[in-house]
Amino acid sequence: MARVKRGVIARARHKKILKLAKGYYGARSRVFRVAKQAVIKAGQYAYRDRRQRKRQFRALWIARINAGARVNGLSYSRLIAGLKKASIEIDRKVLADLAVNEKAAFAAIVEKAKAVLA
């Protein structure tokens, strides 16, 4: 059986990991063993945070909608209930944008929700 020398494959594997670890601090970007662990951990954080980002943005939108609703004399939960009763289907992302950038339009939507609730 012939001897297998893995020089090319090992170097390619190391290069790939070190390329992914580029920009990391200290040994994490230079030493293969440490870099490999850092890259794996970074991947785990990225995977987790892609899911958390969705939760965090939804929480931010709800906070903005709540603030805008309270300025117009309604709580967040009452506003959402009113919008559902009025069959107004605007998602929270758009509502939050209206609450921040288009206060008049948001106020009009809140008034429609109030009218249905009253």
Curated annotation (Swiss-Prot):
This is Large ribosomal subunit protein bL20. GO terms for cellular component: ribonucleoprotein complex; ribosome. Pfam families: Ribosomal_L20 (PF00453). The keyword Ribosomal protein applies. Keywords: Ribonucleoprotein, Ribosomal protein, RNA-binding, rRNA-binding. It comes from the Bacteria. The gene is rplT. GO terms for biological process: ribosomal large subunit assembly; translation. InterPro entries: Ribosomal_bL20, RIBOSOMAL_L20_CS, Ribosomal_protein_bL20_C. The keyword Transmembrane helix does not apply. It comes from Ectopseudomonas mendocina (strain ymp). Binds directly to 23S ribosomal RNA and is necessary for the in vitro assembly process of the 50S ribosomal subunit. It is not involved in the protein synthesizing functions of that subunit. NCBIfam families: rplT_bact. PANTHER family: 39S RIBOSOMAL PROTEIN L20.
